[in-house]
């Protein structure tokens, strides 16, 4: 842990097309090796694909993020030689970051032919509470439920 204290939360400018901070954060998480224009093409392409099937793409993205975001997660805590998986609540900013990360990871593993289509399909699935990202959230919740007995080790 840093001795200099915590760093301040950076403000993300809203994206130019939709004027949404959520989409701007999503673009930044899709980005690899600083290639922001490629990430923008992927996210905007996915939003266009969703827009063809659904009326409001931003609402669908928000619904998908809400469905995927975890309420609890487990953290390792070492107590007297034993390591316990202690369930802890997830704060709002981490909840959104995890939801975005899981959506992107599970969309990259999908079988469609292009990344915008993969991302669009995963977002559509997540908005209807199915898909790889939802499985990841359910698995996290199951782990927390199974280790509920160690909740008193919370810090």
From Swiss-Prot:
* InterPro entries noted in UniProt: Ribosomal_uS7, Ribosomal_uS7_bac/org-type, Ribosomal_uS7_CS, Ribosomal_uS7_dom, Ribosomal_uS7_dom_sf
- Please, one GO biological process term? translation
> Mind listing the UniProt keywords for this protein, alphabetically?
Ribonucleoprotein, Ribosomal protein, RNA-binding, rRNA-binding, tRNA-binding
Database matches in SUPFAM superfamilies: Ribosomal protein S7
Name one molecular function that GO assigns to this entry. Answer: rRNA binding
List the CDD domains: uS7_Bacteria (cd14869)
GO cellular component terms? small ribosomal subunit
Organism superkingdom: Bacteria
Q: Which HAMAP family match?
A: Ribosomal_uS7_B (MF_00480_B)
User: Subunit arrangement?
Assistant: Part of the 30S ribosomal subunit. Contacts proteins S9 and S11.
Which PANTHER family would you find in this protein's record?
A: RIBOSOMAL PROTEIN S7 (PTHR11205)
What task does this protein carry out? One of the primary rRNA binding proteins, it binds directly to 16S rRNA where it nucleates assembly of the head domain of the 30S subunit. Is located at the subunit interface close to the decoding center, probably blocks exit of the E-site tRNA.
Indicate the family of this protein.
Belongs to the universal ribosomal protein uS7 family.
What protein name applies here?
Answer: Small ribosomal subunit protein uS7
Species of provenance? Xylella fastidiosa (strain M12)
Print the organism lineage.
Bacteria, Pseudomonadati, Pseudomonadota, Gammaproteobacteria, Lysobacterales
| Gene that this polypeptide is encoded by | rpsG
């Amino acid at each position: 842990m840093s001795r200099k204290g915590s760093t301040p939360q950076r403000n993300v400018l809203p994206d130019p097309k939709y004027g949404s901070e959520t989409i701007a954060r999503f673009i930044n998480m899709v980005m690899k090796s600083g290639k922001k224009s490629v990430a923008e093409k992927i996210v905007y392409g996915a939003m266009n694909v969703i827009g063809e099937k659904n009326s409001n793409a931003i609402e669908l993205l928000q619904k998908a993020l809400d469905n995927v975001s975890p309420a609890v997660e487990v953290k390792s805590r070492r107590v007297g030689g034993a390591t316990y998986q202690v369930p802890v609540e997830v704060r709002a900013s981490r909840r959104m970051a995890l939801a975005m990360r899981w959506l992107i990871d599970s969309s990259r593993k999908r079988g469609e032919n292009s990344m915008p289509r993969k991302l669009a399909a995963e977002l559509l699935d997540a908005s209807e509470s199915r898909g790889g990202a939802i499985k990841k959230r359910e698995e996290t919740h199951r782990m927390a439920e199974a280790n509920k007995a160690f909740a008193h080790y919370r810090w």
